[in-house]
């Protein structure tokens, strides 16, 4: 268990996941949280990361920093996604180990699992078959971080754990028109279509892929829970165990936003993985479950979007 006064470093505190973890830690009474902006500490510069850890000596680390993006971004910047994420992860994890960090939690992504993995996907299906090509570079980087944590545990007896969230959404998301994930992209497009009186919007694919979505504050709650209650080499899936089609999601976002125009589909564009549902029985058996249903989470996300218009420019 983390002491309330323990020094806790949250890497990536300005992102959606990192900021949610900071909120959750504060909500639970942890009062010695340290953070650094990218300007203050470039996590891709090994010397700077080593210096930071040597000086600050954080007892616990939540590694939520990452370069993320949707299908378009992942296809256009394969090398960038792989280099940035692998470099960042190795620098932070290695420096944490070198400086006696008591426990580290690595945040991954469900895209690490094979494209055609049996559904729902168990933690044990990792590396059993081919990855989804549209985000292969990012997935390989995340697998490397996960495995490095496991290997440190096995070789040096560290207590480094990993969490693999399903598709996330919520406050402080990235609403960039081409470099965002599906929920923020749909929120922005539906909102702009409503405001501008656009009669129809066109979405990629045919709307058939099945997806699962977890509100980011629920993930943050699980992250703190696992830091206090879980140790092990195998990752832990984070999700709701519920799924819906992209078409159903698009219609639900339109409902929440208040867009009443027509939704069309461009089947010449890629769908991505046909189905992605996590088996969350491991987290459930540990005593955790999500709280926020999708429609309520989308409503909260849209409120956040409206209250923070500059996020659409990121």
Question: Predicted regions span which residues?
Answer:
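Conserved Rossmann-fold NAD(P)-dependent oxidoreductase catalytic core, especially the SDR/UDP-sugar
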Residues: 4, 90-135
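NAD(P)H-binding glycine-rich loop region in Rossmannoid oxidoreductase-like domains
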Residues: 46-86, 98
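Short-chain dehydrogenase/reductase
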Residues: 82, 86, 134-146, 176-184, ...
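Active-site Tyr-X1-5-Lys
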Residues: 133-166, 185-196
